[in-house]
Swiss-Prot record:
Boundaries of every Guanylate cyclase domain copy: 204-332, 615-744
Subcellular location: Cell projection, Cilium, Flagellum
Gene3D superfamilies: 3.30.70.100, Nucleotide cyclase
Name under which the protein is recorded: Photoactivated adenylate cyclase subunit alpha-like protein ST-
GO molecular function per UniProt: blue light photoreceptor activity; FAD binding
Alphabetically ordered keywords of this record: Cell projection, Cilium, Flagellum, Repeat
Sequence ranges of Basic residues compositional bias: 821-834
Subunit architecture: Heterotetramer of two alpha and two beta subunits.
Xref: PANTHER family: ADENYLATE CYCLASE, TERMINAL-DIFFERENTIATION SPECIFIC, ADENYLATE CYCLASE, TERMINAL-DIFFERENTIATION SPECIFIC-RELATED
Family annotation (Pfam families): BLUF, Guanylate_cyc
Length: 1019
């Protein structure tokens, strides 16, 4: 479609596309203009006065394999040979060389371009040809610009131009290996991945799991070798998947997702079986102590329809979406239960030939999570792969003195200049808050981090007065007329002159390139102000380095960079514009850590594998599996794209780092000090889901049912890059990576939208910890914590309330069986709330647990020294008090208690021996009768209420105590706060006068006998 522009009945221009027409109208400052649209048939591609048809323009970037030879003479010889060939076939080309990169634009017919580019790609003098643009053109833009000596030094001495060409090209080629394979293929075809619409495909999909990789991560002796394991797994997966005509979609923690076309089902199974054999060979050749001898894989294969699409905006992923992805994941999980290394669905079996079908063995119908109908699966005749045996081998594994090839080092042990930029620690408090629309198109500000990483020690020693140069690029928010540019130059010149800042500003086809020279403090301050300017967007700092003297002599040199230089070499503006746009587009697919490391002038291959503690976040859409079954592929894409957009924006706005986009699931991490930011991001995600449902409540739209759960956990992860130049992954892996998914799954069971664990709650600010958290009875085999607090968040369809909930985590001496047993409420107890508080009670309890330890007799090696008592008190979630072993004289009949044996759970205590009658119940105490092994046992719990605190008494029948025995005086409190902990608290009660009931100033542990109470210790 063409648009013909008329003014006063005279045609002044013909423009292709409505958008270009609007830009022309704005830039020309013409108000009385009329635009007419004309639809044109295939002759649209007819170009120029020569009558040529099917003209196309192709722009590519490549890296020289011989940069040391690329001098002026070398380029002149190359240009002479190319010019003769171009004239013979009627192709127009220009070449720009900026060491070590070639930029070339070719104009010609489809047939000529395909022939020429095939020969160019095979030329050994360069490598990694990346297409920046490839599309039809209406005419030859560069006229007779044949292959001239186009060395950058012969075109301009402008340092901004040289910097932008080198830095963007360098970052562009480095990011290539981090791109999803589909996005990289799009670029090779000259297409922008984030501009492509969803494309339905029939695929054979597989999930490849590293067996018991979480056990490897949890093994303290194998932490150093995790990077080696991941590197070997990534390399083997890429080699076998791509070697059988497949593509790797993504890598998750210890998981590879790959797919094949519908006609490559047999090749897919051959590749997966070969992967298992390669890992077996790898295990057999490992020296003693190598963790690679414990690497096994498990695969599940499914066939179905999926949508190849771009999901997300600020951080995006070019991936597959659809119900078949969820089913393939469930089938792989089912293989754990069936103890088989390879499991495939009935749909995959139908795609196989007769010969391979005969080798299959049916494994009957099985129910998988999230699906109403059972799934019929098949397997090959292969040895069993038992996860329990692999786990046992890993737990018993001793690495000895083996040293990893890529050792993982603690993050804190590295010098600040050597630490990878894994956290976005840009200070935001002093910067004006931006609206969501303003922040949407802006990339994460990396200025202060670049200053820490890229500057040498000599520059850091110079402080704020060190002279530096900063170059950034940005895109104009709207077309700039000559009056707009004149206004920018006038204001910037006056501002820079007053601040004694020099620099240059280049404007090319909607792209700004600016270089600033000044002391470090002044440049940083000005750059932060420039970022807030609404006249441009996508602000990216591409270069920052110390200099000895100023490059520019004026406050703002603008005209020489736009007119004189571009008049000398017109094609340069297209190179700059297309390269910058492609760089900004690709940055959304590459991890932020890699991008920050690149823009600081570093080689990402030198990123050091580190172990660091982080706050991990995981969120996904509730009931997504049945939702994907009932919705069309386009509706699934709409739901995921909308949800991922909101999640990535909320996470990045709070300083978090997005790790992976896994279908409807988003994982991210925050710094150890960013627990509050993580909670705020959770609240924003939940609020968005609720607002989205409200917005589409009365409209028949699939987004009206979007509800989500969010989980937070804290733990150590390994951050390392794995793979090769073909495909590189920046991996964030750790035991917490799997655990946070289980925490997020608790949102369905608990009926809450946000669930956090105890370590996260310990790192929250006092305001959030004391007023924003409520207890969670469901948990992960751990001690319950109870926090009062108001409701937080917005209600959603699958959740009764949206609270921050704290699940249980493993404590010393606790067992999974016991933890699961006590998760269920007993008869007559409420499902939620404190199991021993009266209904409606608002009293804040102390949560405590009691443990008994056998102690040796003083001065001897005998174990008849008595019982040690440990009381763990969690006071309102703010601190933890712990009293370790307390010596008690032994006497009478002693019960056998193993080391660390848990004899009390939360606020309950076990009875020791059978045959004793339950004592009279003290006030507010509840008794529970249990039958174990045919014997009656009583367990007693007492909770005494006060205004704001609760004094807990753990009661245990102990017949072995001597009659009339009284223990020593109480220990002093371990209260971490200032002042004497034994002082009377205004809200704590005095000792009670009721007979048989101890009410202490501090929480106390008591042992109960039928004759009365004996205090052991208080604190």
């Amino acid at each position: 479609m063409y648009n013909r522009v008329y003014k006063e009945r005279q045609e002044i221009r013909t423009i292709q596309g409505l958008e270009a027409s609007g830009q022309f109208q704005t830039a020309s400052n013409i108000t009385d203009i009329q635009i007419y649209s004309i639809n044109v048939t295939p002759t649209m591609s007819k170009g120029g006065e020569t009558g040529e048809t099917q003209l196309r323009r192709l722009m590519y970037l490549s890296a020289s394999t011989e940069p040391e030879k690329c001098n002026a003479e070398y380029l002149a010889d190359m240009a002479h040979v190319a010019t003769l060939r171009n004239k013979a076939i009627g192709v127009i080309r220009f070449l720009l060389y900026s060491s070590p990169f070639f930029f070339q634009v070719i104009e010609g017919t489809d047939e000529d371009l395909d022939f020429l580019f095939a020969k160019i790609s095979a030329d050994p003098r360069h490598e990694r040809c990346i297409v920046l643009a490839n599309g039809p053109c209406t005419g030859r833009m560069y006229g007779e610009w044949h292959m001239k000596d186009s060395h950058i030094d012969n075109i301009t001495n402008n340092p901004a131009i040289k910097t932008i060409l080198f830095q963007i090209a360098r970052s562009f080629t480095s990011m290539w290996s981090y791109l999803p394979k589909n996005a990289a293929n799009m670029l090779l075809l000259g297409k922008n991945p984030n501009k492509q619409g969803p494309e339905p495909r029939s695929v054979v999909l597989t999930f490849i799991y590293l067996v018991e990789f979480s056990s490897i991560l949890a093994h303290p002796g194998l932490t150093e070798q995790c990077a080696d394991i991941l590197a070997a797994f990534v390399e083997a997966s890429v080699r076998n998947c791509e070697g059988t005509w497949g593509l790797v979609a993504k890598f998750i923690t210890g998981t590879c997702v790959a797919y094949w076309p519908i006609n490559r089902a047999e090749d897919a199974l051959v590749g997966l079986q070969q992967l298992s054999e390669d890992l077996a060979v790898l295990r057999s050749y490992q020296p003693p102590g190598s963790a690679l001898s414990r690497i096994y894989s498990r695969r599940g294969v499914h066939y179905g329809r999926a949508l190849l699409c771009n999901a997300g905006f600020r951080k995006a992923d070019f991936t597959l979406l659809g119900d078949c992805i969820n089913t393939a994941s469930r089938i792989t999980s089912l293989s754990v239960k069936l103890k088989v290394p390879l499991l495939l669905s009935f749909e995959v079996r139908c795609l196989l030939g007769d010969e391979m079908r005969e080798e299959l063995e049916r494994s009957a119908l099985h129910k998988v999570k999230g699906r109403d109908k059972p799934v019929q699966v098949y397997q090959f005749n292969a040895p069993e792969l038992d996860s329990a045996l692999v786990r046992a081998k890993i737990e018993q594994f001793n690495p000895g003195r083996y040293r990893a090839l890529c050792p993982v080092k603690p993050y804190e042990s590295l010098h600040p200049a050597q630490r990878p930029p894994i956290f976005d620690d840009t200070p935001r408090e002093n910067q004006p808050k931006l609206s969501q629309v303003q922040r949407r198109d802006s990339l994460v500000d990396r200025l202060s981090l670049i200053a820490k990483l890229a500057f040498p020690s000599s520059m850091m020693a110079g402080g704020e007065g060190q002279l530096i140069t900063l170059t950034y690029i940005s895109q104009a928010a709207h077309p700039m007329s000559r009056f707009d540019l004149a206004s920018i130059q006038r204001i910037a010149f006056a501002r820079n002159e007053s601040s004694n800042i020099t620099g240059s500003l280049l404007y090319v086809s909607g792209l700004f390139v600016q270089t600033l020279d000044d002391p470090k403090g002044a440049v940083e301050s000005l750059y932060l102000k420039i970022r807030q300017d609404k006249r441009h967007k996508d602000v990216v700092a591409v270069f920052m380095a110390p200099i000895d003297e100023r490059v520019y002599g004026t406050p703002l040199d603008m005209t020489s960079a736009t007119e004189e230089m571009l008049a000398t070499f017109p094609p340069l503006q297209d190179v700059l514009s297309q390269l910058a746009k492609s760089f900004i587009s690709l940055e959304t697919y590459v991890p932020s850590t890699v991008v920050r490391y690149l823009t600081a002038g570093n080689n990402p291959r030198n990123l050091q594998p580190v172990s660091v503690e982080v706050v991990m976040l995981a969120t996904d859409i509730c009931s997504f599996t049945p939702l994907s079954e009932k919705c069309s592929l386009t509706e699934v894409w709409t739901i995921c794209n909308t949800f991922i957009d909101a999640c990535t924006s909320a996470i990045c706005n709070e300083g978090g780092e997005v790790i992976k986009l896994i279908g409807d699931c988003v994982t991210a991490y925050f710094a150890p000090t960013g627990a509050d930011n993580a909670v705020h991001a959770c609240q924003e995600i939940v609020s968005f889901s609720a607002q989205l449902r409200d917005a589409f409540h009365d409209v028949l739209d699939c987004r009206s049912v979007v509800a989500c759960g969010v989980g937070l956990d804290f733990g150590q992860v390994i951050m390392a890059q794995c793979g090769s130049l073909r495909l590189t992954e920046f991996v964030v892996a750790g035991e917490v990576s799997a655990r946070v998914m289980a925490v997020e799954a608790l949102t369905r069971e608990a009926g809450r939208a946000i669930v956090i664990t105890e370590p996260v709650s310990d790192r929250l600010s006092a305001k959030l910890r004391d007023t924003g958290i409520v207890p969670c009875q469901e948990g992960l085999h751990a001690v319950l914590l109870w926090y009062p607090g108001p409701r937080m968040g917005i209600g959603c369809a699958n959740h009764q309330e949206d609270h921050l909930r704290v699940p249980r985590r493993p404590g010393p001496g606790r067992h999974e069986e016991g933890g699961r047993r006590h998760q269920r409420p007993g008869p007559g107890r409420p499902r939620r709330g404190h199991p021993f508080l009266p209904q409606g009670s608002t009293t804040r309890p102390h949560q405590f647990s009691v443990q008994l330890h056998p102690l040796p007799k003083l001065g001897t090696g005998s174990s008849d020294g008595g019982i040690g008592v440990s009381l763990h008190v969690y006071s309102a979630g703010r601190y933890r008090q712990q009293l370790h072993r307390r010596q008690i004289a032994a006497g009478g009949q002693r019960r056998s208690v193993g080391p660390g044996q848990d004899v009390a759970r939360a606020t309950r205590a076990h009875a020791c021996d059978a045959g004793h009658q339950a004592p009279d119940q003290p006030a507010n105490a509840q008794y529970e009768r249990q039958f174990r092994g045919g014997q009656q046992r009583w367990r007693t719990c007492g909770i005494v209420h006060s205004n704001a605190f609760v004094t807990g008494v753990g009661l245990v029948q102990q017949p072995w105590l001597d009659e009339g025995h009284r223990p020593e005086a109480p220990h002093q409190s371990l209260h971490p706060g200032p002042g004497d902990p034994s002082e009377q608290h205004p809200h704590r009660p005095n000792r009670a006068t009721e007979p048989g009931l101890l009410v202490a100033r501090q929480p106390a542990v008591c042992l109960h006998r039928p004759e009365g109470f004996a205090q052991i210790c208080t604190f």
